């Protein structure tokens, strides 16, 4: 076995992993129109309409009714078709909240509990989801995972109860998924300006992270324009 060693000056942010989340209909999918280069869009939740007319995005249809088998076959297809995958700069999955639910429903439908998922099904989907995300990162592409938003009740060290906006991912693997990403960004709409933007800095109220630069927020169209800023005002 051999190991590759490289200098930190060679780190390339073009192959980073993003997790963007927001309530349904907020504009998550539209964000993909601002990606540079070519994108392979994995259409899990059938939200492809905001991408209409974009010549740089190819859409891969995904059968959520057979999601458990389909996702496994898709991972094998990606592994076996490097010449196709090498045509793309980005792989986008829209979205992983629905992916988890559809895989769980698929297992429950084929199980022994009258379509209700068994406890073991949750564990299988948890481990399969994380393992497949690791595999996707091995493809050395920019990855963009989209997710819905939910609220999580938490407590500060002082004992104060707070409500935090978080990606709609099972609590058991949420931190693991976020840990595999360089950016976790919450999309919000500003009613006064009429513009959409991303929150990139974590707080008691927002689950977020940004390891690529010093930005704490950005306009929707600037998410993938990585670079430090002098002032975050």
Give the ranges of each region predicted by the language model.
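Single-residue recognition of alpha-helix boundary sites
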Residues: 54, 105-106, 193
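Conserved GTP-binding G-domain of TRAFAC-class P-loop NTPases and closely related GTPase folds
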Residues: 135, 151-233
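P-loop NTPase motor core
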Residues: 93-175
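Conserved P-loop
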Residues: 2-93, 97-102
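Structured loop/turn residues at beta-strand edges in well-structured enzyme cores
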Residues: 86, 138-139, 179
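Alpha-helix C-terminal capping segments
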Residues: 31-36, 136-139, 226
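Generic beta-sheet signal
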Residues: 42-44, 146, 187
């Amino acid at each position: 076995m051999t190991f590759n060693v490289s200098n930190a000056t060679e780190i390339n942010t073009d192959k980073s992993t993003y997790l963007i989340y927001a309530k349904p209909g907020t504009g998550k999918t539209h964000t993909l129109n601002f990606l540079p280069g070519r994108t392979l869009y994995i259409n899990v939740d059938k939200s492809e309409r905001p991408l209409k007319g974009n010549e740089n995005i190819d859409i891969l249809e995904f059968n959520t009714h057979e999601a458990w088998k389909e996702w496994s076959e898709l991972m094998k297809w990606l592994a076996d078709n490097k010449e196709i995958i090498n045509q793309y700069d980005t792989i986008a999955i829209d979205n992983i909240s629905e992916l988890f639910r559809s895989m769980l429903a698929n297992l429950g439908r084929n199980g022994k509990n009258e379509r209700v998922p068994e406890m073991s099904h949750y564990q299988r989907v948890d481990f399969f989801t994380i393992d497949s995300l690791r595999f996707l990162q091995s493809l050395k592409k920019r990855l963009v995972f989209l997710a819905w938003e939910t609220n999580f009740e938490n407590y500060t060290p002082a004992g104060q109860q707070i409500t935090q906006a978080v990606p709609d991912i099972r609590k058991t693997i949420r931190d693991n998924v976020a840990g595999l990403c360089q950016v976790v960004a919450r999309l919000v709409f500003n009613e006064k300006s009429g513009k959409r933007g991303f929150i990139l800095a974590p707080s008691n109220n927002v689950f977020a992270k940004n390891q690529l630069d010093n930005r704490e927020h950005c306009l929707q169209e600037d998410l993938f324009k990585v670079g430090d800023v002098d002032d975050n005002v």
